[in-house]
């Protein structure tokens, strides 16, 4: 075979491959933990902590076909040691392959952004001095 035919076959094979590897899509569930961050995802909501701050989504977190998500919710950046409020409107954005997640919290009424943080499914969050709530909405 000549080189042009081989190059054409190689391009066809590469086009049909998923070079980025498998991606997770669908509803995110379970406990995800990292350094000074955690996420507990249930059927209808999720509870997120980054440092001494926390918030909840208004719905389940669902990743698209690329493993990306963008979910609305509320977030309190003045939570610890005494919750002073208010809860700010927020967007919880990121991506996952189903085992590792990158998460960013953006308050939509201020210029505050937390993260990105990296979380692992099934890993206990390592929160340091700030406690983590065990139930969303708490």
Where are these regions (language model features)?
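Tryptophan-anchored aromatic micro-motifs
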Residues: 21-40, 71, 103, 126, ...
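Residues that act as N-cap/strand-start positions at coil-to-secondary-structure junctions
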Residues: 26, 33, 42, 55, ...
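N-terminal glycine/threonine-rich, aromatic-flanked beta-hairpin/loop signature
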Residues: 35-77
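Short, cysteine-centered beta-strand-loop-beta hairpins and adjacent loop/turn segments enriched
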Residues: 53-55, 77-86, 109-113
């Amino acid at each position: 075979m000549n080189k042009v035919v081989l190059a054409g076959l190689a391009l066809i094979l590469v086009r049909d491959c998923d070079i980025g590897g498998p991606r997770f899509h669908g509803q995110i569930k379970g406990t995800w933990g990292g350094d000074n961050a955690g996420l507990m995802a249930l059927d209808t909501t999720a509870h997120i902590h980054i440092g001494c701050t926390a918030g909840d989504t208004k719905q389940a977190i669902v990743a698209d076909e690329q493993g990306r998500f963008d979910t609305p919710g509320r977030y309190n950046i003045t939570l610890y040691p005494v919750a002073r409020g208010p809860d700010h409107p927020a967007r919880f954005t990121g991506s996952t392959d189903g085992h590792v997640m990158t998460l960013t919290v953006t308050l939509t009424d201020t210029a505050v952004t937390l993260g990105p943080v990296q979380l692992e499914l099934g890993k206990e969050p390592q929160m340091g001095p700030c406690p983590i709530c065990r139930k969303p909405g708490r």
